[in-house]
UniProtKB/Swiss-Prot annotation:
HAMAP family, per database record: Pantothen_kinase_3
InterPro entries: ATPase_NBD, Type_III_PanK
Subunit-structure text: Homodimer.
Gene Ontology biological process terms in this record: coenzyme A biosynthetic process
Protein known as: Type III pantothenate kinase
Functional description taken from the UniProt entry: Catalyzes the phosphorylation of pantothenate (Pan), the first step in CoA biosynthesis.
Pathway connected to this protein: Cofactor biosynthesis; coenzyme A biosynthesis; CoA from (R)-pantothenate: step 1/5
Binding-site positions, substrate: 96, 103-106, 181
Residues noted as binding ATP in the record, renumbered to the chain: 6-13, 131
Keywords in alphabetical order: ATP-binding, Coenzyme A biosynthesis, Cytoplasm, Kinase, Nucleotide-binding, Potassium, Transcription, Transcription regulation, Transferase
Enzyme type, top EC level: transferase
Cofactor binding remark: A monovalent cation. Ammonium or potassium.
Amino acid sequence: MIILIDSGNSRLKVGWFDPDAPQAAREPAPVAFDNLDLDALGRWLATLPRRPQRALGVNVAGLARGEAIAATLRAGGCDIRWLRAQPLAMGLRNGYRNPDQLGADRWACMVGVLARQPSVHPPLLVASFGTATTLDTIGPDNVFPGGLILPGPAMMRGALAYGTAHLPLADGLVADYPIDTHQAIASGIAAAQAGAIVRQWLAGRQRYGQAPEIYVAGGGWPEVRQEAERLLAVTGAAFGATPQPTYLDSPVLDGLAALAAQGAPTA
């Protein structure tokens, strides 16, 4: 059994992959903890049906958090290898000028999405809405040409609340023409997030001559879903397309499982 770890800025998501089980079994459902609650990780490890052999993970929460996670795993008899982005893995080619500068979570997420595809597939747009929002494209040639990073919905809201003298920590509904400050902030955040998706969808369509399929993930997606789907529908209609995002619960863990299954380079 191999433990899969996705250590984000706010949440720690965990799962497992068992290459020795029939059909290389996965966890029934991933489990998420607050990233500061490593006792919860230890308790979860104690519930596993088998003793894990090792762990594979990504960590964007800093060196100290990675060391604390590793110590918790070692206490359970399990060492971890932290993934780094590679120039090439699982058929996915990294287009970054310096491939290892790409966040390991983004790399694993793209590997997870690509692992779901048939050998011939359209362009893929992978959008993850966490503390940061990332939008990454995979071409039909399995090349990642680049992507965007912007503050996630909660970070945008916090920046306005704590970086200004008079704006509140907004809790409002999205509207075309907001009529109070809470609505104005909520609508601006949704517009920024949705606009980034539409921008990259249009860029992919222009680059590849066909509309990208959209995959979305992350805890911030429900907040922007309605606005994103509305703008995508309006934009797609101009090209006779109906872009419809597909939500994935744990594409980073899916990517880690795929890499572990194939013995692909991880560091």
